[in-house]
Amino acid sequence: MRRDDLVRSGVSQITATFHGDQEVFTIRQLLEAAVSHSDNTAADVLLNLVGGPPTVTAFLRDHGIRNMRVDRGEREIAREFQGRSGLHALSSEETPQQKDARLQRGYAAYLKDPRDRTTPDAAAHFLKKLWQGQLLSPPSTRLLLDLLYHQTIPDRLLAGIPPGVRLADKCGTSYTLDGMTAAFNDIGILTWPDGHTVIVAAFLTASHAPDERRRALFKRIAQVVVSDLHP
């Protein structure tokens, strides 16, 4: 990886440990960073390695997954959020008022953009196929599920899961602007000791709820699922 591969949005272990003009990371390190730690830099590097967004979307279609599409990497999505799409550089003379207006435009543009979208049903369908071994080879399936079991955001669905039930999940979060959070998501596979499995896809969009209420909502979703759908 080169320094210009770094994505300056979100939390990135890769960025934090990067020194000099280039660093070498294994595919396993990038996968762990992207899946378990939601590292945007790692996600973009992996996306480019497999052939870019069209390759990923084609893979989904080839495996019968509709209404899920990947059009851009995290860097491009961050530029849209920041109102920088089409801009090569920000003006050094930008005023606080101009910056606020730019961010507002970017946030509104992201919410209206049809690209890089999925539905809860499509996300659940993806997880079902993954769980059933219909997407990847057996070793790759085991690896991805293990990375999902070790994702590091504890206060969404995982907060409502009792001892003995395992959760392999992936969270997604946008930043918050003026009290609105564009995306606050968690999708996962719950598994009981006897093998009983339930798939959950929970998406919260354009929410004005404070962070503690959003986290409490996802905890409650998991509690209801466990209570009503246990074996």
Predicted regions and their residues:
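Structured C-terminal helix/loop/strand segments within mature extracytoplasmic catalytic/sensor domains
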Residues: 53, 108, 112-120, 124-166, ...
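Flexible glycine/proline-enriched surface loops and loop-helix/loop-strand junctions
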Residues: 26-30, 37-43, 103-111, 129, ...
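Active-site-proximal helix/loop microenvironment
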Residues: 67-139
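Short alpha-helix boundary/capping motifs
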Residues: 62, 74-75, 87-89, 151, ...
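Short, flexible segments with low predicted structural confidence
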Residues: 5-6, 17-18, 31-32, 94-96, ...
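Conserved catalytic core of the tyrosine transesterase superfamily
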Residues: 2, 83-87, 221
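Generic detector of well-ordered alpha-helical segments enriched in charged/polar residues
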Residues: 28-32, 47, 57, 104, ...
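Active-site-adjacent loops and short helices of periplasmic peptidoglycan-processing enzymes
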Residues: 1-76, 80-82
